[in-house]
Amino acid sequence: MEGQNTVLSVVGPLATNAASLRLVTQALLQQEPWLHDPLVHEIPWRADQESEIKSAKKLCFGVLRTDGIVNPHPPVSRAVEMVVKALRSAGHEVIDWQPPSHRTINDTGFNSWIYDAGKDVRSAFALSGEPMAPQVSFYQSLEKEYTASEIAAINVEVRRLKKEYMEYWNSTVNKTGTGRPVDAIICPLAPFPAARKEKYKYYGYSTWVNTLDYTSVVVPVTNADKSVDKKDEGYKAIDEQDKRTQDDYDPEIYDGAHVSVQLVGRRLQEEKMLAVAEYVGGLLHA
């Protein structure tokens, strides 16, 4: 949304491996984009962040297996555990990540996308006449536009949430055994593998990253396997939203689908997280 500065949009490049992502990021920074876009930070490529990871004898990761709102499908849970196992086998530490509520973060971030009652989204669709997918059709019925005071209050809340999460992250220095807070977080990218058409109904595993302005790199891990990733027929849902997501899981349909996880770092840690992603990818696919 033009003029919405609470949670800014970014371009997320895609590549077949982390080394290619590093190359394209370096190439972009060499063009000094801060001379062309006033919102770009004037920060050239920082090789020290990259070398810090490559020279570390031991890293520590936090693992978020579920956000407590919507639990991941079996293939996604298995992928997270594969990453945990690979890191521990390589001598690194993995601790449980028990952060402040992601629900509050997600709800606050979502509110920033509807400041204008959906006018920007509807005008974009009107240019082509393309119908809205069911997942975003709610933009057609929004009526309330946020006032300046309401937007300011949300901005204050986002700042509070960032500080709260930062303080939790800092506190992990007492749990890691490395003398540093957790280096990165391992968590699902979405509760499902590669999404089925019109089934991408929950965005919470990426919304919190965007709202806090953190750095995330997605790493491919495995493929769904119907012989392993069985549906839990006795599953007890958290609520109706979680139930709908779990009901959508079908081992036969998802069989062979790509499954990824995301590795999350703090603000402005692109070089560091690309190095982490390259290392983790190497462990998984050695």
Predicted region positions:
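Glycine-rich phosphate/pyrophosphate-binding loop shared by adenosine-nucleotide-utilizing enzymes
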Residues: 259
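Amidase signature
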Residues: 27-211, 221-253, 268-272, 279-286
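A short core secondary-structure module
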Residues: 1-45
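Buried hydrophobic packing segments
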Residues: 21-24, 140, 263
